[in-house]
Amino acid sequence: MVYSMNISKLVDPPLPDGYWGNVCVPVYVALAAGDLIARPLAATAALIKKSKQAVDDEYVRSYIDFQELHRGEGITAGAVSAFTDWRRLGHGEVDFGWGGPDAVLPLSWRILGSTEPCFLLPYGAGDERRRRGFKVFVALRRAAVAAFREEMQELLSQQQQQSSVGKL
C-alpha cells in the first residue's frame, strides 16, 4: 500500500515562505491485500501511523536521490496499488488572476512510483458537477485496458438495471 505524504514541515533547511511546488513523497506500507482485508481497520491505521513517523529529512533526501538516479528508466513500485485523494488539496481553489482552474491533473501517471495509480480528482472550479462528485483518473498498462472497459461496462449496465427497477 502506498500513500502520498506532505513533507513541507520535515525538510531541513525549511522551505521558504510561499513555496509553491511538490512537497509530497510516496510512503509505503508493506501489507498483502489478504492481510488488509483480514485485519481490523485499527491495525491498518496503526501501520500507516508508524510509517508516517518514519518519514524524516533523511527519508525525503533519499527519495529525491533515488528519483534522480532512476529518472530515465521510470520508477516503479512493482505490484503496488496506489490510491491518492486530491479532492481537498486546494488546487482547484487557486486563482492566478483569471479564476480557478478548469482541471486539476497529475503531471505524470508515475508520480507515486506505481505502475497503476488511481487519483480521485475534483472537477474544475466552474464545473457544476463539482458539488455532486469527483473524477477518477486511472492509469493502466495497455494490456489491461480492454478488461477494464468490460468491467466498467458491466458496472454501468448493473447500475442502469438497478435504477430502472427502482422506478417501477
Question: Which residue stretches match the model-derived regions?
Answer:
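Acyl-CoA-dependent O-acyltransferases
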Residues: M1-L168
